[in-house]
């Protein structure tokens, strides 16, 4: 089972719960999750926090089937069978990975408009871990 230490878990709450990224003061690119050095210009370590919209489009995706998920997702796998995991290009630029929810795996498509919602990700040692999942955008 994957283990995330309590201090690391608490440090990443702004990214996991509120989609807070960092905007490079030199090149203006948005990094998510925030980095110590800009991953685009590699020259700046000065950033401003930026609230990401949570809106984007599916860049690519994969369907996770039985046996393909880490142990902490076994309960979800048993309950629902296959589930999609997508790399989404957010409106602000960064690409982020996350599970899809409320979407028939057969209907997930490249360029599909999605938004983020705070959802239960998994339970580890009796602690429920929350984070964002992507859902189809409402029209």
Task: For every predicted segment, state its role.
Residues 102, 117-139:
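OB-fold/S1-family single-stranded nucleic acid-binding modules
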